[in-house]
Amino acid sequence: MEKRLMLAVTISIVLMLVYPLFLAKISPPTIENNMQEDISQQLDNTKVTRTALPKTTTVTADSKRQLPEDAVSTPFSTTRYGLIFSNIGGSIQKIVIKDDKRLDSDLVEDAMFDAGILAIEGDASLRGLSSQSFTITRDTNTLYTEKDGLRVEKTVKFLKDQYGLRASIALTNISQASKPISFQITTASNISSKEAYESRYIEAGTYHRNDKMQRLAGGKLKKSNELKERDIYWLYLKNKYYSIICKPEFDVSGVFTRYVSGNPVIGFIIDDRDIQPGETRTYEFKYYIGPTEIHELEKVDDSFGKALNFGIFTSISMVLLSVLKFFYSIFHNYGVAILLLTCCISVVMFPLTFKSMSSMRKLQELQPKIEKIRAEHKDNPQKLNKEIMEIYRRHKANPMGGCLPMLLQMPIFIALYQTLMRSVELKGANFLWIKDLSMPDAAFHMPFSLPFLGNAINILPILMIGAMILQQKLSQVKAAGGQTDQQKMMSSIMPVMFGFIFYNLPSGLVMYWLTNTLLTSTLQFSLLRKT
């Protein structure tokens, strides 16, 4: 049964660690009643109109264009943002998130030409607009230009005390002839993926009026896609901790994704009726640009909370996150909050854990009898199985009794793993010697690096190895013939393997596993004393 226990735990760990990679290849499962599909799958089943932009105005990964000599970068600063506008294309080139809870973060960098946020590229008078020089007026946060009888004016208004802004695009026909309006506007691009393993969390997607989420991640985000649908409510691009969400205040024709110079670029497709001489047409957008934190998201728009996704067990993760934040509101330290959350989970899971341990203990005590029967009936498999099942029946032991309770706990383990891996609340949070609970604890640094481990000495994974060895010692009972070589090998290898897996994971997650292991060991010790 010890092998079954190790198998169950190993499956749990593998699922938790492989899950982020798995998410990059499939669409996330439902969140409450939300249907979530992959955009690429939708493209296979939906008639899509593809409009290739002119090659002369598109930056590709193979030919990165340089800004002209007359390029001017103009900074705008608020309590929440540091933005840099470029006069070339009249777009946002860089975004720095200001956060009093954690270090400022460079969210977007080097977004130029049609990859610049709010950049427009289209047909007729709008062709080449992403390379056009704009005039920037700081007093009104306005950028404007004129091209082929069309005046284009972009205005940005910042929302007070929120990670939000409103952007408007005003097109005025200053010619004597009507002008066709068909263009693409970039709403998000070049989102940061500097932190270790962060690129696996980069995803884009759309939220629809029928409460449906569509997402695109991993290798599929590197392909050019266009989806012509008019029920799109908003579009997002996010990394592990931060999100850029854009909600149009009008009906769009669809969305597009591109991969420019190694970065994802997303935006809206707008096919509108011709604009008449003297007419002005305005397109309004609401933006959220900030940490993926539910109360900040919902400050800007009630529906933006849908962007917070922890995977298949999001509903459980949201409960765990609420409990974590409740403890933080009392003790003002996320390290303490994680310890208390771990204790709460252990209390809730106690009946299942106790049942699992009791069942395994009973099966271990029956091992001498089972081994004796194996020796007596080794040449008669049918008789052997019958005798073993009779022993289980007589002693009211269930061979699956140790594994099943653990498997029932797996959703909580996976949900908590995702919560501690993705919650921006832990970013920059310290505890004891740990400077950042979203990163390995890195108590010391060596002058050299080890393969796969790096040069940091992480104390928590080492303590976790010791705790797991202690837990295994407590779970062992003396059986006839002692432990098999296989059991001894498992006892030696498993803690080291787990320590290796957890070595560079966030310290908040490792702290949970260490605390949970110690609590489980205490329960095992109490059970051992009673038997």
Model feature map: region roles:
Residues 21-104:
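Juxtamembrane extramembrane loops of integral membrane proteins
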Residues 33-34, 56-66, 135-137, 158, ...:
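Intrinsic low-complexity, intrinsically disordered segments enriched in polar/basic residues
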Residues 1-2, 45, 145, 152:
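Generic N-terminal leader/processing signal
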Residues 26, 64-69, 76, 141, ...:
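Generic low-polarity alpha-helical segments
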Residues 1-41, 85, 169-170, 186, ...:
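Helix-loop-helix
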Residues 75-306:
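Soluble non-transmembrane domains of integral membrane proteins
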Residues 1-5, 70, 221:
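Short, charged low-complexity linear motifs
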